[in-house]
Amino acid sequence: METLLSPSTLLSPLRGSKKKPASPAASASSSSSSPARSVVSCALRRQQPPPQAVAAWRGDGGRGGGVGSWATFLQHGLAAAALSLAISMAPAPAPAVASEFDVLNGGPPEDTYVVDDAGVLSRVTKSDVKRLVRDLESRKNIRINFITVRKLTSKADAFEYADQVLEKWYPTVEEGNNKGIVVLVTSQKEGAITGGPAFVQAVGDEILDSTVSENLPVLATDEKYNEAIYTTAKRLAAAIDGLPDPGGPTFKDNKRESNFKTKEETEEKRGQFTLVVGGLLVIAFVVPMAQYYAYISKK
């Protein structure tokens, strides 16, 4: 095997030797041995492991590319870990919040009478308002819708937005004649009431002005949104039914007692303090002098 694959025998002849013409037997033997030589050479090449395979499992630097393979592997692992951590710590997308335009395009509520876009009303308040205005509509044929929004971007105040809602929901005078709209803007702490001619006449300007100036803004300032909506509904329903006005919200006198003393109390305390200090000074001078006088008298 070594004789067949030796470089000296395969590549160059011996020095000083002359090339002789090959005999037919030698040519035949040479031609017959060359295929075997090529087969053995190919077999030996197949047995050598490729350098890529060695570099793939060696990490000690014994073969070329081992250290680089481990470094690349660590870089990919760290990048994947960082990406996973960033995804896990990313805040969840906030749920979509309806806007004033969604309220306009949504149309009037068919059965609830309340569009709580601001999300400040409880289920109890919605149920009480629904029961109150549904009974009012069945008896007086006057419908009142209540709307709460967080803020306004298209209109300057709640009154313009209320008029816009009335025109959008009830385009004709016949449709909006007996309809009322109550709007409460939580961020601006203000409210507005508008409606068709029949609604305004049934409620009266005095109750409308009083409700807008007392119930809605005052209670909204204290973030009592449920009370603001429900008391407004009660006052409007009472006015339409011709009942006595329940009135606006009652205010408690939360006057706090001051910790500061009045002028009279200060003068009185000052006189007492002067008397005490003067007495202590007299005692401090008189007692030692009396003791000294008694001591001298004994001598």
Swiss-Prot record:
It comes from the Eukaryota. PANTHER family: UPF0603 PROTEIN YGCG. InterPro entries: TPM_dom. Pfam families: TPM_phosphatase (PF04536). The lineage of its organism: Eukaryota, Viridiplantae, Streptophyta, Embryophyta, Tracheophyta. GO terms for cellular component: chloroplast thylakoid membrane. Residues 1-14, 22-36 have a biased composition (Low complexity). It comes from Oryza sativa subsp. indica (Rice). Residues 1-41, 42-98 form a transit peptide. It is found in: Plastid, Chloroplast thylakoid membrane. Residues 252-265 have a biased composition (Basic and acidic residues). It is a single-pass membrane protein. Belongs to the UPF0603 family. Keywords: Chloroplast, Membrane, Plastid, Thylakoid, Transit peptide, Transmembrane, Transmembrane helix. The chain crosses the membrane at residues 276-296. Residues 1-60, 244-265 are annotated as: Disordered. This is UPF0603 protein OsI_019212, chloroplastic.
